[in-house]
Swiss-Prot record:
<protein>
    <recommendedName>
        <fullName>2-dehydro-3-deoxyphosphooctonate aldolase</fullName>
        <ecNumber>2.5.1.55</ecNumber>
    </recommendedName>
</protein>
<keyword id="KW-0808">Transferase</keyword>
<dbReference type="InterPro" id="IPR006218">
    <property type="entry name" value="DAHP1/KDSA"/>
</dbReference>
<dbReference type="GO" id="GO:0005737">
    <property type="term" value="C:cytoplasm"/>
</dbReference>
<dbReference type="GO" id="GO:0019294">
    <property type="term" value="P:keto-3-deoxy-D-manno-octulosonic acid biosynthetic process"/>
</dbReference>
<dbReference type="GO" id="GO:0008676">
    <property type="term" value="F:3-deoxy-8-phosphooctulonate synthase activity"/>
</dbReference>
<dbReference type="InterPro" id="IPR013785">
    <property type="entry name" value="Aldolase_TIM"/>
</dbReference>
<dbReference type="Pfam" id="PF00793">
    <property type="entry name" value="DAHP_synth_1"/>
</dbReference>
<comment type="pathway">
    <text>Bacterial outer membrane biogenesis; lipopolysaccharide biosynthesis.</text>
</comment>
<keyword id="KW-0963">Cytoplasm</keyword>
<dbReference type="InterPro" id="IPR006269">
    <property type="entry name" value="KDO8P_synthase"/>
</dbReference>
<keyword id="KW-0448">Lipopolysaccharide biosynthesis</keyword>
<comment type="similarity">
    <text>Belongs to the KdsA family.</text>
</comment>
<comment type="pathway">
    <text>Carbohydrate biosynthesis; 3-deoxy-D-manno-octulosonate biosynthesis; 3-deoxy-D-manno-octulosonate from D-ribulose 5-phosphate: step 2/3.</text>
</comment>
Length: 284
């Protein structure tokens, strides 16, 4: 699959989607994106910067949601202009899609909305690549129906069907907890869409702090290594210069100063894994 200026897939080195959870300020966004660009250039990692202009599903109605759609998109456009990076952001409603698609390179659908057929169809008709997150309530094989919805809508609109990614972000395991079943990464390959693993939301503890979500960022390296060992097309990770001060999802964000070491380890593992054949089909 072609994503911007690079090809993605299981036969390619992993690509990275990374950035802050939400756009907090222009300066922090540019600084964070610039540092990630430096790291990824050194490690030869294809990189897409991500950040949200709005967090529509916060635990509390009083939580910070962002700087607003217009300002958030303006700042993301500055990332593109100043740093030459492709950008991704999530959309939350059909009426937002046209404006967002005019700015960003990749759309993302929130996990909670993966079963909303009209919404998936509208994203698919945007003409943009779409990273479709698997809901925390969904079995991995159910993603085939979701990807098929997107492809059907694209085909009916006369657009490429080869623009959709399936993203694993953990599954609900009791109250306020998520677990990652690494089998899901292999199962989701059956969609014939590139599979992305979200290593930071997978360690989230949804609503775990009452009015906000908790998280266990110490397990991000563990799950990221496991996903790369299984074999993925891409990784998604949120990071922040100071997670303790982050306005959204700080407990599961990787400290920015730790990203280089983590990614270096993951690149080494990815190279080793993808030199060998994937044997799942031989065991049937």
């Amino acid at each position: 699959m072609k994503l911007g200026d690079f090809e993605i897939g299981l036969d390619r080195p992993f690509f990275l989607i990374a950035g802050t959870c939400v756009v907090e300020s222009e300066q922090m966004t540019i600084d964070t994106a610039g540092r990630l660009k430096e790291i990824c250039a050194k490690l030869n990692i294809p990189f897409i910067y991500k950040s949200s202009y709005d967090k529509a599903n916060r635990s509390s109605g009083k939580s910070f949601r962002g700087l607003g759609m217009d300002e958030g998109l303006r700042i993301l456009s500055e990332v593109k202009r100043q740093l030459g990076l492709p950008v991704l952001t999530d959309v939350h409603a059909e009426h937002e899609i046209e404006q967002v698609a005019s700015v960003v390179d990749v759309l993302q659908t929130p996990a909670f909305l993966c079963r909303q057929t009209d919404f998936i169809h509208a994203c698919a008709r945007s003409g943009k690549p779409v990273n479709i997150k698997k809901g925390q309530f969904l079995a991995p094989h159910d993603m085939k129906n979701v990807i098929d919805k997107a492809r059907d809508a694209a085909r009916e609109a006369g657009l490429s069907e080869d623009r959709f990614m399936a993203c694993e972000r953990g599954v609900s395991f009791g109250y306020n907890n998520l677990v990652s079943d690494m089998r899901s990464l292999a199962i989701m390959r059956e969609t014939n869409a590139p599979v992305v693993f979200d290593a930071t939301h997978s360690v989230q503890l949804p609503g775990g702090q009452g009015t906000s979500s908790g998280g266990q960022r110490e397990f991000v390296p563990v799950l990221a290594r496991a996903a790369v060992a299984v074999g993925v097309a891409g990784l998604f990770m949120e990071t922040h210069p100071n997670p303790a001060q982050a306005k959204s999802d700080g407990p599961n964000a990787v400290p920015l100063h730790r990203m280089a070491d983590l990614l270096e380890t993951l690149v080494t593992l990815d190279r080793a894994v993808k030199r060998a054949p994937f044997l799942e089909s031989d065991f049937n």
